[in-house]
Structure formats: C-alpha cells, structure tokens
C-alpha cells in the first residue's frame, strides 16, 4: 500500500522569526504543530527576521524603494552596532533610492512593504514550478502577503487560505486615504477569492461578512492563542512592594492615563496603597500622552519605565523569553486595550501570554464583549470603556476600585497563582486550521 503524499504548504508571512513581533509569533508558533501533522512547510518572508534553520525559508527583499529602505534599516541596525557607521550607510542608501522613493510616494502612497507581494509572487511561482503546493497560506499583518497569495492562486490554481490579523477596515470609517482604500481593496479580494478567510475576533468576521455577503461560510473566526510558555512555571514570590506590570507597546490611544488617574484618586483616600504600589512599564518608549501625564502627576514616583527588552547574548534568552519571566514576577498584570474604534474588532496578542501567567489580570476593554468574556471567564477583571452613559472618569474609578480590592487581597491573605491553564492554545488553533484546510487539498486518487 502506497503511503499518502505529505501535504506541501506555501506560507506567505512578511514578518517571520522577529523577536517580540506579534505578527511574527502568530505564524512561527504554528510551525511545530503543522510539521507534527505531517505538513511540509515552505516559508516566504521579509528579511528583517532571522533565517529559520528547521523549515525551508526564503527571505525576500521587496521590489519597491520604500520597502528596500525600510528593510535596510533593520538589517543594518542588526549588523552594525556602531551608530555612526549605521547612519552613514543609511544616508548613502537613502540618497541612491531617493528618486525612486519620490516616484513611489506619488504613485503608491501606501505602507512601505506593499511591493513585497511581487517578490513573493515571483519566488512562489518559481517554487511551484519545481514542485506544486497543496495550499497557499497568507498571514498578516502586512497586506502584501495576501496580494501575493491571491496572485499565486490565480496563476497556479492552488487553494488559498488567508489569515487576517487586524481588521483591514476600521469600524465606522469610510476609506478615504490611499492606504485605507488599498486595505479595503485587499479585504474585498480576500472575501471574494480566498477559499478560507480567517479573522481573529467574532466582530471582525461579522463586519467583513456584512460588507461582503458572498463570503458566507468561507469566513472563519480563530483565536490564535499561545502554547504554554514554560514547562514549569517560575515561582511567584511577592515582595515588599505591590507590583503592577504593564507589558507591550503604548500609543496616544492606548496609554497609561486611566491607570495613573486611578492612582491619583486613591492617593486622596488610600495614601498607604499608593506608597506601596509600583507600576512597572516594560516595552518600547512611553507614548507622548502617558509621558506628559506622568511628568505632572503627584504619583509619578510610583512609575518605573523599564524600556524594551532585547535578546541577551550572555544567557541566550530572547527578548520574548525574558519578558515572559518578568510577567511571572509581578503581583498584577495590567492590560490596556486602547480607546479607538478598531478595538471593537481586535484582541491584543498580549492577552494570550497573560492568561498563561496565572497572575491576576486587570484590564481595560473597549467595546469588545468577546474579549471581556474571555477575561471574566478565567476569573480576571475587565473594566469596559466606551459604553453609553460612561464619562471620561468612569474607567479610572472602576480601575481604582478593582486595584484597591486586589491590594487588600495582596496584603492578606495574598494573591496566589490561579492554578488555571489557559484554554487558548496555538495547538488548538492549528487543529482548527487543519480542519478547514484539509477539504481544500485536492489529491489524485
């Protein structure tokens, strides 16, 4: 009896093997499970990440000058520690690319990675001629991956599965800029032509179906999750301070202001709580709104900005691994969802990491019942924002109340681990992916 031929998938992911990038982790975490399921994987990605040593991985430069300049910044920064050398090389590269940059800006004023689709198409077409693929799987992130997936489907007839990380159209917004119109066009292509199209929240899928009724049952919702980050959880050891930890990026619409205002309110009636509390902020730079608020706040001494955590060559730990260790060391994990319309259809990937830490989570959730239900279902606190009848201070008041309750538990009897494993795993996500992809694969009898 002849053994069935292994399925061969072409994965298109502009961000891949990039430490700390959610768009990268979403796909790289799936690969071990796909390989265990007998899938032969070939990956096409940009050049900013590290080359994979396990699967066939082709790193491709974009075709356009804006994309070339963007990728060069990452590659040169990684290769040259001397900032002077880096700046000289980038200046020279920018001068060489300048005419093309101006022309591209005039003709195609969209995200710099757009032209990567052409490089991915050309390489994917060449690989398919050598040995056909059973499935094209575009994932992102950058919409260039989906453009390449669609072009390869048309050229080869191979089934196409598209996985959309963040909504391509902001709720309540009519696309008017070149970038927004391009994203709307890409969503239309996905909804009309992908054999399976995946979104990461129920509302994002519902909105896409409302705009494109023809999507029907080809549209799916998938919670990407993450697998257990530790074989054995590092011990949680409370200290003399009540540590609240925020991990991840901040912005003008996802900032620390509600939490700082909660501390300010508590300062008036619970100065003992504020004196014992430290907010540890780990990630990139503070956004301008948070920085301005902290600078003039009477509780500014409670805030410690620890910055971005990079890979440690001494221990071999990636930035992500170090951050996961630090998450285990805090008393409470703070999750800020943001306050812009896209939050209604978006769940931050940080939530899945937090849920594995078994530490109490204090979260703000903006008009996203699915995310609030996930948190509360695991015993955590979700303070909803943006609801009807809520004023600007509602979230801060609710955060203050929740923080006070957590502080009292921390004092006595303590805030022990929950003991609950997260139900949202990459393994489960890949199981769904295989269920949806298997019927698409056409093999001769």
Language-model features: locations:
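Conserved donor-binding/catalytic core segment of Leloir-type glycosyltransferases
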Residues: 237-254, 260-263, 429
């Amino acid at each position: 009896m002849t053994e069935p031929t292994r399925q061969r998938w072409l994965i298109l992911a502009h961000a891949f093997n990039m430490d700390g990038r959610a768009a990268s982790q979403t796909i790289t975490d799936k690969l071990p499970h796909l390989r265990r399921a007998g899938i032969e994987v070939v990956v096409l990605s940009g050049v900013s990440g590290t080359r994979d040593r396990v699967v066939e991985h082709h790193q491709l430069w974009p075709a356009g000058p804006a994309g070339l300049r963007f990728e060069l910044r990452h590659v040169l920064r990684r290769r040259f520690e001397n900032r002077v050398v880096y700046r000289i090389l980038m200046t020279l590269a920018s001068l060489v690319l300048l005419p093309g940059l101006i022309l591209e800006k005039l003709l195609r004023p969209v995200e710099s990675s757009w032209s990567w689709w052409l490089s991915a198409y050309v390489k994917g077409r060449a690989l398919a001629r050598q040995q056909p693929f059973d499935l094209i799987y575009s994932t992102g992130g950058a919409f260039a991956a989906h453009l390449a997936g669609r072009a390869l489907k048309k050229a080869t007839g191979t089934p196409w599965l598209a996985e959309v990380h963040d909504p391509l159209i902001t709720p309540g917004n009519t696309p008017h800029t070149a970038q927004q119109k391009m994203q709307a066009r890409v969503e239309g292509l996905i909804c009309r032509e992908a054999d399976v199209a995946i979104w990461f929240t129920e509302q994002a899928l519902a909105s896409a179906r409302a705009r494109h009724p023809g999507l029907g049952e080809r549209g799916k919702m998938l919670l990407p999750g993450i697998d257990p980050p530790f074989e054995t959880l590092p011990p949680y050891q409370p200290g003399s301070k009540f540590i609240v930890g925020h991990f991840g990026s901040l912005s003008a619409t996802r900032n620390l202001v509600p939490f700082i205002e909660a501390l300010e309110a508590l300062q008036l009636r619970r100065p003992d709580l504020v004196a014992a509390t430290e907010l540890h902020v780990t990630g990139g730079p503070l956004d301008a709104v948070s920085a301005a608020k902290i600078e003039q706040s009477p509780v500014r001494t409670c805030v410690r900005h620890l910055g971005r955590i990079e890979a440690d060559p001494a221990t071999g730990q990636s930035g992500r691994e170090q951050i996961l260790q630090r998450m285990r060391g805090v008393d409470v994990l703070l999750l800020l969802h943001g306050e812009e319309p896209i939050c209604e259809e978006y769940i931050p990937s940080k939530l899945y990491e937090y849920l594995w830490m078994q530490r109490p989570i204090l979260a703000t959730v903006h008009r996203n019942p699915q995310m609030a239900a996930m948190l509360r279902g695991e015993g955590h606190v979700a303070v909803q924002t943006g609801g009807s009848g809520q004023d600007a201070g509602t979230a801060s008041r609710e955060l203050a109340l929740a923080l006070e309750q957590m502080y009292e538990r921390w004092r006595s009897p303590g805030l022990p681990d929950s003991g609950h494993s997260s139900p949202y795993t990459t393994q489960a996500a890949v199981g769904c992916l295989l269920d949806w992809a298997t019927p698409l694969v056409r093999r001769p009898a």
